Design a protein with these regions (language model features):
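C-terminal motif of bacterial Sec signal peptides marking the signal peptidase cleavage site
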Residues: 16-19
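Extended ligand-binding regions for polar small-molecule ligands
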Residues: 21-23, 31-32, 77-78, 82, ...
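Extracytoplasmic small-molecule ligand-binding "clamshell" domains
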Residues: 32-116
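Short helix-initiation/N-cap motifs at beta->coil->alpha
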Residues: 39, 94-106, 149, 184-194, ...
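Short loop->beta-strand "edge-of-pocket" segments that line small-molecule binding or catalytic clefts
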Residues: 51-56, 73, 154-168
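Periplasmic-binding protein-like
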Residues: 58, 137-145, 208, 212-253, ...
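Acidic, polar ligand-binding/catalytic clefts
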Residues: 81, 93-156
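A ligand-binding cleft/hinge motif common to bilobed small-molecule-binding domains
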Residues: 103, 120-128, 173-176, 190, ...
Length: 290
């Protein structure tokens, strides 16, 4: 009987040791898997996914819009395709995520996109929430109005309604500097322009580069107030702290500067919309901005 108890104790001991060994092996495997996940770079994840997720506009020609064939077009799209080509070897490996101005920051924070290329103006407030790469456009706030009653100064907006798209630098600028001006706000950019055409406001404030194009293609309207505030820059944005992708983008953009890529993109996408009155160097950036 003592021998049987001894055998049982030995068997039980073997089972306990085996269970401990399996547990240690599982823990080691989990730790190794976690370590591999933690060390996997952001760029490796994009390459493994096989597509670059880019936030763009669908209703802001000539910068970002969807054409009659349902294809994304515009100045921002030309840049997105080049980034995808240099990062993934194929300009078509892009998942376009359509956005409105007020949603751009949240898309990055929630990891729904890798890069925002939606005409994103650099501001100190935004730079606290996202990281901006080198710029590829320069812009100021402008005001477009009807030719029959042009607005050429902020003083002329007193007692009138100014249309602004929500989440734009134009909205912020007027709320901060001219709170007495009555703002009529719209979620979508195309809605804002339709409101101006319908007479639901006396003028519309937005990036002047966009207004030059819109007025050129909409007879009866003029950008009589082309510049307000300081000159701003438009740049790609990545999630705050995404240093690896930010550094890759900066190197990429510096290479594009050397190629005069943005001037060529202007000639292809913006010049036909702007006409001959606006020159490339008034809009594009081809060198680092300190």
């Amino acid at each position: 009987m003592k021998k049987i108890y001894s055998y049982l104790l030995i068997a039980l001991l073997i089972l306990v040791l085996a269970a401990c060994n399996n547990s240690n092996n599982n823990e080691s495997a989990n730790e190794e898997e976690t370590a591999q996940t933690e060390t996997k770079s952001v760029i490796d994840e994009i390459k493994e996914r096989g597509v670059l997720r880019v936030a763009v506009f669908s209703d802001k020609p000539p910068f970002g819009y969807v054409d009659e064939k349902g294809e994304n077009q515009g100045y921002d799209i030309v840049l997105a395709k080049r980034i995808a080509k240099d990062l993934l070897g194929d300009e078509s490996k892009i998942e376009y995520v359509i956005t409105e101005p007020q949603a751009r920051v949240d898309l990055l924070k929630s990891d729904k996109v890798d890069i925002v290329l939606a005409n994103f103006t650099v501001t100190p407030e935004r730079a606290e929430q996202v990281d901006f790469a080198h710029p590829y456009m320069k812009v100021a706030i402008g005001v477009v109005s009807a030719e029959k009653s042009p607005i050429s100064s902020v003083e002329e907006l007193k007692g009138k309604k100014l249309i602004v798209p929500k989440g734009t630098t134009a909205e912020t600028f007027f709320m901060k500097n001219y709170p007495e001006v009555e703002l009529v706000k719209y979620d979508q950019i195309n809605e804002a322009f339709e409101a101006l055409k319908d007479g639901r406001g006396d003028a519309l404030a937005q990036d002047n580069a966009l207004l030059f194009s819109w007025a050129n293609n909409n007879p009866g309207f003029t950008v009589a107030l082309p510049t307000l505030g300081e000159l701003d820059y438009i740049a790609p944005a990545v999630k705050k702290g995404n240093t690896e992708l930010l550094e890759w983008l900066n190197v990429e953009i510096e290479k594009l500067y050397e190629e005069k890529f943005f001037t060529k993109a202007y000639e292809e996408t913006l010049k036909p919309a702007f006409g001959e009155t606006i020159k490339a160097d008034a809009v594009v950036v081809e060198s680092k901005v300190e």
